[in-house]
A protein has these predicted regions:
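The substrate-binding groove and active-site-proximal loops of carbohydrate-active enzymes
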Residues: 83-87, 116-124, 168, 322-327
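Catalytic domains of carbohydrate-active enzymes, especially glycoside hydrolases
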Residues: 53-72, 142
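Hydrophobic faces of well-ordered beta-strands that scaffold small-molecule active sites
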Residues: 35-41, 65-67, 108-111, 146, ...
Length: 416
């Protein structure tokens, strides 16, 4: 129900003298689903294992976890964590994880977000092989039968991008790399979900371009599906915050996408700064550029801090936030969530906490407060109204089943 329909309904009730607070509350409430709200465990890098992040989920009232399972020797320095032992994951451990999920009323997925098609060739293969390990883990946790997906980036080859037709060449490389990965995953009953962050900080601020993850825009994702011979087990984790700083209404993206491909939605806020000196000087469509510091000062331009201090991530005039925690951001969350509900989205929302006033403080109390606030901010649109307020209906959870599988560990060389 939109605003106009609400006031029309209220006026009709008033005309017959039956306007009551309860009636108005129901009139104002769009049809809610019963979507679980999960936490992404990247905010808990200091927590050592699965059991510790289960406790975090229970602390804040979440219904699940997107378990970050990055390589412990990853070259990434930001927002990484490892909460399952990917090198020693056994059927016994899988059963234990499933048993804990059933006991605690939680559900899970796994993921690691690295560059699979760009960067040093040897590192690309390491990242690809790691995703194959996570596909194996997802299968041992039940895969699609238990709604356990494997989240990943695609990445981007900057060397190819510099050539004529570089974007299409990246599409072709994506097809070459991901076709055997997807075939392997499909054989194990696992879906891969790609996330849409452009990862602008993966290149130094001296780089003129900063598009570093192929599915960073809707057109790219449509082209990815089109170029594959079999896209049946490739889906999306959509994060609206990345489109917000590109000055795109994420509700429009939801309307324009293949909705059948939407498996997860990340909840993360963005506050744009369109009038900052950086935006006024450099524009809002292209990244700030690093130049000689003395020249920058002579020209009277705002200083761009070093990459070591985050300058490579501070080029698009925004800050990460959490909706409902410490003020507003630049996303119309009511519109976005209601758009999803109207289209029948029934899958998990996953809070990714990169809030400057929450996880980025380094304070665990503030991190947990941010998660709690975002759950409460989201609940009135996605949960039914019960006797104790808006709450998730736990009776809708189906028990996770324990598959009797133990796939061997494979590498890209094995799949060639």
């Amino acid at each position: 129900m939109n605003r106009r329909e609400f006031f029309k309904s209220a006026a009709a009730l008033a005309a017959v003298g039956t306007v009551a607070p309860k009636a108005l509350a129901h009139a104002a409430k769009p049809k809610a689903g019963n979507n679980p709200i999960w936490l992404m465990t990247s905010a808990f890098a200091s927590d050592p294992d699965f059991e510790s992040v289960v406790a975090r989920a229970k602390q804040v009232g979440a219904q699940g976890l997107e378990l970050c399972v990055f390589r412990r020797d990853t070259d990434r320095q930001d927002h990484i964590a490892t909460h399952l032992d990917y090198d020693n994951f056994t059927p016994e451990r899988a059963k234990k994880v499933i048993d804990i999920c059933n006991e605690e009323g939680l559900r899970i997925s796994v993921g690691a977000y690295d560059n699979l098609i760009g960067g040093k060739p040897e590192l690309q293969v390491v990242n690809q092989n790691h995703i194959l390990k996570l596909v194996r883990i997802a299968a041992m946790l039940g895969g699609d039968a238990n709604d356990v997906v494997c989240g990943t980036f695609v990445g981007y080859d900057q060397a190819l991008a510099a050539e004529d037709g570089g974007f299409e060449k990246n599409l072709l490389k994506f097809k070459k790399v991901f076709t055997p990965i997807l075939k392997y995953a499909k054989g194990l009953g696992v879906t891969l979900c790609v996330e849409n962050c452009p990862m602008e900080g993966w290149v130094p601020a001296s780089s003129s371009a900063c598009y570093c993850n192929l599915p960073g825009c809707l057109a790219a994702r449509k082209l990815m599906y089109a170029i594959l011979d079999d896209d049946s087990n490739l889906q999306e984790t959509y994060d609206p915050s990345h489109d917000v700083w590109q000055h795109i209404d994420p509700s429009d993206v939801i309307q324009a996408m293949d909705f059948r491909k939407l498996r997860r939605v990340h909840i993360k806020g963005t506050r744009n700064f369109p009038n900052d000196a950086e935006a006024v000087n450099w524009g809002r469509l292209f990244p700030r550029q690093r130049v000689n510091a003395a020249l920058e000062k002579k020209a009277g331009l705002p200083e761009l801090v070093s990459d070591e201090k985050g300058g490579n991530w501070d080029r698009m005039n925004y800050e990460p936030r959490l909706p409902g925690f410490g003020g507003s951001d630049s996303c119309d969350w009511t519109k976005f969530l209601e758009t999803l509900m109207a289209k029948g989205f029934k899958n998990p929302f996953v809070i990714e906490n990169e809030g400057f006033n929450s996880s980025h403080t380094g304070n665990m109390g503030a991190t947990l407060q941010g998660f709690r606030a975002t759950i409460l901010n989201t609940a009135p649109v996605v949960w039914p109204l019960g006797p104790n307020g808006y709450e998730f209906d736990k009776s809708a959870l189906k028990p996770m089943t324990t598959p009797n599988v133990n796939p061997k560990v494979v590498t890209m060389a094995d799949l060639a």
